[in-house]
């Protein structure tokens, strides 16, 4: 479980001091949850996120435990280092909006015909309760030839999950190489 510290002071000087000590500034918020300003050690946070198997993961702050999902993050444009992260605290049975990653499997037929695989949409916006949240959308790209694509409407439908993106948006496709 990922452990962090609650920030007592939310001043700019306090944030700079925490960043200097190797902390990542974070906010936890959600429906029915009071906003919490906190900080996590940067390297363990990144390592934990890369190894987690589900979108929802637990974090511990002092004696409180929250089930959260990464809602938004900010990176330094020059160094590409994480600066800040917003975590959405989820409550069982309460619908929220999430962004679910798209993963693909297989090798498209179109690659042999001088095509390039193009991932147009890396995340799909959905609305559901946390217990119905899919970990990812898996797309089989093997049958795709040049100038063919998979649209949002072609994705696997999950029960109790509403896809918020428009049906005609391309998720992944094979385009002709120039």
Swiss-Prot record:
Alphabetized UniProt keyword annotations: Ribonucleoprotein, Ribosomal protein, RNA-binding, rRNA-binding
InterPro entries according to UniProt: Rbsml_bL25/Gln-tRNA_synth_N (IPR020056), Ribosomal_bL25/Gln-tRNA_synth (IPR011035), Ribosomal_bL25_b-dom (IPR020057), Ribosomal_bL25_C (IPR037121), Ribosomal_bL25_long (IPR001021), Ribosomal_L25_dom (IPR029751), Ribosomal_uL5_bac-type (IPR020930)
One GO MF term: 5S rRNA binding
Disulphides: none
One BP annotation, GO: translation
Record's signal peptide: none
Keyword match ATP-binding: no
Cross-referenced Gene3D superfamilies: Ribosomal protein L25, beta domain, Ribosomal Protein L25, Chain P
Residues spanning the membrane: none
Listed HAMAP family: Ribosomal_bL25_CTC
Oligomer status and interactors: Part of the 50S ribosomal subunit; part of the 5S rRNA/L5/L18/L25 subcomplex. Contacts the 5S rRNA. Binds to the 5S rRNA independently of L5 and L18.
Protein name: Large ribosomal subunit protein bL25
Organism expressing this protein natively: Helicobacter pylori (strain J99 / ATCC 700824)
Annotated gene: rplY
């Amino acid at each position: 479980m990922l452990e962090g510290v609650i920030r007592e002071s939310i001043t700019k000087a306090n944030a700079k001091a925490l960043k200097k000590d190797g902390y990542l500034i974070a906010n936890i918020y959600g429906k029915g949850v009071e906003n919490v300003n906190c900080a996590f050690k940067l390297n363990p946070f990144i390592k934990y996120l890369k190894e987690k198997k589900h979108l929802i993961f637990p974090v511990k702050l002092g004696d409180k435990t929250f089930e959260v999902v990464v809602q938004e993050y900010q990176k330094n444009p020059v160094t590409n280092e994480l600066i800040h992260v917003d975590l959405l605290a989820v409550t069982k049975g309460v619908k929220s909006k999430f962004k679910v990653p798209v993963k693909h499997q297989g090798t498209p037929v179109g690659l042999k015909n001088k095509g390039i695989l193009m991932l147009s949409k890396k995340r799909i916006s959905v609305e559901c309760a946390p217990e119905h949240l899919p970990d990812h959308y898996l797309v089989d790209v093997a049958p795709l030839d040049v100038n063919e694509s998979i649209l949002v409407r072609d994705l696997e439908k999950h029960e109790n999950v509403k896809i918020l993106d428009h049906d005609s948006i391309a998720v992944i496709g094979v385009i002709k190489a120039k």
